[in-house]
Amino acid sequence: MEKEDKDLRLDDWDEENIEEVVILPSSRHPAAPPMDLEKYRQRVERYSERLRQRESVTVITTDLEELLFEAEQRTLQYDYYNALGIYAIVLDERLKERNATLIRLLDHSMDEVIPDLATLLSEASSSLGYDSNVTPLLSKEERQHWLTRLVTFWLKRLDNREIEEDLSEILLDMIWQEDIPILVEMVTNELQRLRKGKSSTIVDLNQQYRLRVLERFLKELPYTKQE
């Protein structure tokens, strides 16, 4: 796999790294027509401004919960394209880190739906249960965009042990052999950053935990899923 021009680092996340997720339909579950996801993106991007204008956090939380519930319902209806699109919009807004209150709100809401997202991404990254000529549902490029998004989110959540474990399981479940260099690069970059900031005199237990998690993850990466 050729190295991309732009290094995949934790601090590099921006909208240029984001492409719409397109999932191929199966004969049993034809693709639903695509929604106008840009309207959903604008809706989520307004959260930060609404908070600055002192709008109630409860109102914004309710709106976000309704949005994620819609994604869940679309998944149950096999509308994977639009469900993944909604999840991607919410995650991308979280990664922009516009507002501390919004970060906490988005983290809490995403934590609640991680099991649903895990199931959806597992289905979308595998051909099991679908026509053999539609393999996999996510193309290589689409899958790798999702992996980059999830690794970035995972690296920001390492201190939350339960969520960290859930996210690492999703990553290991999704990856194909050809994806490994991307994950190795991102995790190695974060390891190097943490080691540079390590104090020689002060013991930072949280930092030690992060280092162990990342080192363990790299050891778990050799994977047997083949195209």
Question: Model-flagged regions — what are they?
Answer:
Residues 1-227:
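Eukaryote-biased, non-catalytic alpha-solenoid scaffold regions
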